[in-house]
Swiss-Prot record:
This is Apolipoprotein A-V. The modification Phosphoserine is found at residue 52. It comes from Rattus norvegicus (Rat). It holds the Pfam family Apolipoprotein. Minor apolipoprotein mainly associated with HDL and to a lesser extent with VLDL. May also be associated with chylomicrons. Important determinant of plasma triglyceride (TG) levels by both being a potent stimulator of apo-CII lipoprotein lipase (LPL) TG hydrolysis and an inhibitor of the hepatic VLDL-TG production rate (without affecting the VLDL-apoB production rate). Activates poorly lecithin:cholesterol acyltransferase (LCAT) and does not enhance efflux of cholesterol from macrophages. Binds heparin. GO terms for cellular component: chylomicron; early endosome; extracellular region; extracellular space; extracellular vesicle; Golgi apparatus; high-density lipoprotein particle; late endosome. The gene is Apoa5. GO terms for biological process: acylglycerol homeostasis; animal organ regeneration; cholesterol efflux; cholesterol homeostasis; cholesterol metabolic process; lipid transport; lipoprotein metabolic process; phospholipid efflux. Its main location: secreted. GO terms for molecular function: cholesterol transfer activity; enzyme activator activity; enzyme binding; heparin binding; lipase activator activity; lipase binding; lipid binding; lipoprotein lipase activator activity.
């Protein structure tokens, strides 16, 4: 609850400025629409601006009154000044005082939630390690199954057109068969990864609940969103691996088909060139797939870091505490601010309701 109020003060001070600026530009825009309605529009715009500032002032005074338990005993809650500059300075002073008192609490909550999310990352790590090992084994398997170099192979390729055509057709069949076989091998790994995400994220929900400053409803939404994002990314990773194998099959098939056409025209066919092509294509498949698995692991880190900030914001001294309003896209920045405010209102409403319920029923937890 205390951490939420600190966030509210920080964001409300910005939000009041945004609202005032919005009313000013509405007032300015209305003045330029037509001279006939100018007087009436000026009056309406001025009333809108005044009402917006008065409402923001009222809201902020209400929040300052609720900071009583966090202040020194016997110290009356302040009333905000009536001028915008006075509001800004007074809010800044109050925010610094409350932030100092809440710093240890918020730091502890942020760290506790971070530990739980690190646990989730460690629980998912074996799945990606297993997947990378399977990629390496699959490349070795395909390398062996599609191997072309050997005394018998070279003699067959150089023995005549019919022998070379027969060997290349067999090679084409092996490419199709073994790439499809390897594709099937990856299905169980994808299923285990998706199942593991669902299971471990639910465990995270239970373990992080005592430490999150978010309301239970918002906590559930955040955890569900995390589960959906990671599940979608895991399925996308599986699709990418399947696509890589399709590309490997098509590239090798094309190369063999060109080689077959050359053999049919009695051109010489170098078995070493065919073997090198297979090796290079397999190395490219392994390299691309490793990068995609690494990107998936990085996505897990990014998503868990984001949810850590949502469930337990960092303390005021942390570089990520302040809202990012200096974004080049002002609409996106304001949208992010509005989303944070919506979350704060929900958490504050829950915190006040829970606190009021505890005060009215001091023995409610004991029966």
């Amino acid at each position: 609850m205390a951490a939420v109020i600190t966030w509210a003060l920080a964001l409300l001070s910005v939000f009041a400025t945004v609202q005032a600026r919005k009313s000013f530009w509405e007032y300015f825009g209305q003045n330029s629409q037509g001279k006939g309605m100018m007087g009436q529009q000026q009056k309406l715009a001025q009333e809108s601006l005044k009402g917006s500032l008065e409402q923001d002032l009222y809201n902020m005074n209400n929040f300052l009154e609720k900071l009583g338990p966090l202040r020194e005993p016997g110290k009356e809650p302040p009333r905000l000044a009536q001028d915008p500059e006075g509001i800004r300075k007074q809010l800044q002073q109050e925010l610094e005082e409350v932030s100092t008192r809440l710093e240890p609490y918020m730091a502890a909550k942020h760290q506790q939630v971070g530990w739980n999310l690190e646990g989730l990352r460690q629980q998912l790590k074996p799945y990606t390690v297993e997947l990378m090992e399977q990629v390496g084994l699959s490349v070795q398997d395909l390398q062996e199954q599609l191997r072309m170099v050997g005394k018998g192979t070279k003699a067959q390729l150089l023995g005549g057109v019919d022998e070379a055509m027969s060997l290349l057709q067999d090679m084409q069949s092996r490419v199709l068969h073994h790439t499809d076989r390897v594709k099937e091998l990856f299905h169980p790994y994808a299923e285990r990864l998706v199942t593991g995400i669902g299971h471990h994220v639910q465990e995270l929900h239970r373990s992080v609940a005592p430490h999150a400053v978010a309301s239970p409803a918002r906590l559930s939404r955040c955890v569900q969103t995390l589960s959906h994002k990671l599940t979608r990314k895991a399925k996308d990773l599986h699709t990418s691996i399947q696509r890589n194998l399709d590309q490997l099959r098509d590239e090798l098939s094309t190369f063999i088909r060109v080689s077959t056409d050359g053999a049919d025209n009695r051109d010489s066919l170098d078995p070493q060139a065919l073997s090198d092509e297979v090796r290079q294509r397999l190395q490219a498949f392994r390299h691309d797939t490793y990068l995609q698995i690494a990107a998936f692991t990085q996505a897990i880190d990014q998503e868990t870091e984001e949810i850590q900030h949502q469930l337990a914001p960092p303390p005021p001294s942390h570089s990520a505490f302040a809202p990012e309003l200096g974004h080049s896209d002002s609409n996106k920045a304001l949208s992010r601010l509005q989303s944070r405010l919506d979350d704060l209102w929900e958490d504050i409403a829950y915190g006040l309701h829970d606190q009021g319920h505890s005060q009215n029923n001091p023995e409610g937890h004991s029966g």
